Every structure is written in structure tokens, then in C-alpha cells.
């Protein structure tokens, strides 16, 4: 079932954790591309110097101030990154989707990424946008209403442990533990030492096993 406006209206930290284990879906020209969300970062509208909204609204971050459930896509180091707007319109808070575990359209994703290693396919915000075929033209899309982009509740929710850490690749707010991820999942980016054990698990396998 597609996530509704109320879901995205949650406080940003709560939304970040709630997005883990959900399905991101793109009905693209190449076919259906989807994956489990396994890593996110929260960016708060106040007391968070790393948030793009900290200095107010601009032409580049305007979508971040839209209604909850809006896609905010920006470019950094020639890579596109996608965020989901949270809370209320005009506030400027969002959750960065950092990694997904691919489910459908993997061959198309591999062609988009020009890689052969599955683990390198979607383990980072720029990588997953490239794999899913997302870029600037998708900025501002409403995930609640759009016909080809949405996030949904899986028919069977897997069980997993949520871990947290400081966010990656920022210079301010480095002490804030606003990064959440599925502990042990092999598609999570960053250092393996952040996990409590081996990084060799898959949500798909967990669901099939019922564990």
C-alpha cells in the first residue's frame, strides 16, 4: 500500500526510522525498478547546521519546503541525491535516502550504473539515484499522488534491527546521531564497523525465512 500524507507528516527523526524496510518504486521507461530502503539520514529544520534549509529557502532547495511526501533532489559532486520532505509545508525538513536493497529491475539498474558488482549497485545516495534513473527533473514530485514514483508498505514486513550513527560526508552537526540503517545489511554504505556483526544480511532473505 502506498504511503499517505499522514505518514510523511511525522517528525523527521521518526519518519527516518519508519522509512526503513519500506519499498521505493519507480515505474520507469525501462520497467519497474524497486528496492527496500535500508539506510537514511534525517535533516531537521532547526538546530541542524547541516540541513540545506538552515539558511532559508532558495531556488535550489525550494522543494524541501513543499508539502510532506515531496521529493527533494539535489546535485553534489556531479551526483544526484534524493530526499523525502517531512513534517509540514514551509518547514524545510527532510530524510535523505542513502541506500536501498534492490528488488525489481536489477538488470536495468546494472546498465544504468555500468557496474557488475551487485553490492556497489545502490549502496550510496548518488549510486541509488543513478540506478533508479532519478535526476533533476524528478525534483518536486509528490510521492503521494505521482503515477510512477512512490514509496509503499510491503505486503510482508521483514524483521530487522535499526542501528544509528553520525551522518556521513558533512562538516557541521557531526555529533548528531541522525543516520539510521538496517544493521548488518550488505547494501548499507559506510564503514562495516558501524554494524554489530557481519554485513551480510538481506531483507529479502529475512522476509522469506520469517526471521
Predicted segment positions?
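Conserved, well-structured core segments that form or line functional sites
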Residues: 1-211
Amino acid at each position: 500500500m502506498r504511503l499517505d500524507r499522514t505518514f510523511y507528516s511525522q517528525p523527521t527523526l521518526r519518519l527516518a526510522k519508519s522509512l526503513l524496510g519500506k519499498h521505493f518504486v519507480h515505474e520507469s521507461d525501462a520497467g519497474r525498478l524497486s528496492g527496500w530502503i535500508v539506510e537514511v539520514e534525517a535533516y531537521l529544520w532547526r538546530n541542524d547546521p547541516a540541513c540545506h534549509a538552515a539558511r532559508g529557502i532558495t531556488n535550489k532547495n525550494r522543494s524541501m519546503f513543499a508539502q510532506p511526501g515531496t521529493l527533494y533532489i539535489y546535485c553534489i559532486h556531479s551526483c544526484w541525491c534524493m530526499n523525502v520532505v517531512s513534517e509540514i509545508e514551509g518547514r524545510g525538513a527532510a530524510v535523505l535516502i542513502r541506500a536501498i536493497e534492490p528488488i525489481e529491475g536489477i538488470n536495468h539498474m546494472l546498465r544504468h550504473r555500468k557496474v557488475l558488482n551487485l553490492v556497489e549497485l545502490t549502496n550510496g545516495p548518488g549510486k541509488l539515484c543513478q540506478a533508479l534513473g532519478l535526476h533533476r527533473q524528478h525534483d518536486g514530485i509528490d510521492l503521494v499522488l505521482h503515477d510512477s514514483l512512490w514509496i509503499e508498505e510491503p505486503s510482508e514486513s521483514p524483521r530487522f534491527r535499526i542501528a544509528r550513527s553520525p551522518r556521513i560526508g558533512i562538516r557541521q552537526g557531526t555529533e548528531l546521531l541522525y543516520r539510521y540503517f538496517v544493521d548488518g545489511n550488505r547494501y548499507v554504505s559506510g564503514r562495516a564497523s558501524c554494524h554489530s556483526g557481519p554485513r551480510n544480511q538481506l531483507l529479502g532473505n529475512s522476509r522469506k525465512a520469517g526471521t
